[in-house]
Amino acid sequence: MSSVTLTTTTTTTSTPPKPTPKDEPQEQIYTPWRLFIYDIWVLGIVSTLAWGCRISTYLIPLFRSNVGKKHLDIGAGTGYYLNQARIPSTTQLTIVDNETHALNVALARCKHPSTQTHGIVTDILQPSPFPETYLTNNDKKFDSVSMYYLLHCLPVPVASKCKIFTHLKKYMTEDGVVHGANVLGKGVRKDNWFARIIRRGCLNHGVFHNEEDNAYEFERALRENFWEVETWVVGSVFVFRAKRPILDA
């Protein structure tokens, strides 16, 4: 039988905010119909025509070929990548998001009769986003980590986004791999008319926070934290794979 669990982690930096009227419609946002539209529109049409990166050509193969026995996926979204990547049933899968409803959707979408699936609600920007046991118990460390179309949504400076790699490597095995992709805001090709409309809308509505995001700083952060680094820019998208974390002595 499948095993699906959900954990919520807390930090000492602040107390959880009280729900506001803006937060309440989240369950309505994550309806099957809207998620289907999201997959077709954002991950299909927009990624291909606006950002110049066809997910089925570039990202799904990368995801599929870099899933280990203990895999961590950060930024659950709709669970699209996990679903399309055909993850082996023997993989122990941990999915992370800062929003419970999105996480539940991804958990349900990726459920498999013989897969252990665990969900964690946490803030990946924190220096220690996971419980202490993930540091002290080697059996809990991840040999693969994915983060696709996540970084451009985080409302922090690019330097803070880069620190995620420093935080993450503590929870990875010595031969672990991290891979992902995000839409850049600087140093990429000039947006076509469709991309200009989409980018302006995403920035104005607070969906994107990537005006200063650039390939140079992301690659530098990866090389500071991993021994083996590969990066590509596909259209307006930064794609990366980094192996063997540089662990502190």
Swiss-Prot record:
Biological pathway: Secondary metabolite biosynthesis
Designated name of the protein: O-methyltransferase adaD
Recorded GO MF terms: methyltransferase activity
This protein's encoding gene: adaD
Role played: O-methyltransferase; part of the gene cluster that mediates the biosynthesis of the linear tetracyclic TAN-1612 neuropeptide Y receptor antagonist. The decaketide backbone of TAN-1612 is synthesized by the non-reducing polyketide synthase adaA via condensation of one acetyl-CoA starter unit with 9 malonyl-CoA units. The FAD-dependent monooxygenase adaC then performs hydroxylation at C2 while the polaketide chain is still attached to the NRPKS adaA.
EC number of the protein: 2.1.1.-
Keyword Methyltransferase: yes
Family classification: Belongs to the methyltransferase superfamily.
Pfam family, one: Methyltransf_31
One GO term (biological process): methylation
Organism listed in the record: Aspergillus niger (strain ATCC MYA-4892 / CBS 513.88 / FGSC A1513)
Stretches for region Disordered: 1-26
Catalyzed reactions: 2-acetyl-3,4a,8,10,11,12a-hexahydroxy-1,4,4a,5,12,12a-hexahydrotetracene-1,12-dione + S-adenosyl-L-methionine = TAN-1612 + S-adenosyl-L-homocysteine + H(+)
Biased amino acid composition, Low complexity: 1-15
UniProt xrefs under Gene3D superfamilies: Vaccinia Virus protein VP39 (3.40.50.150)
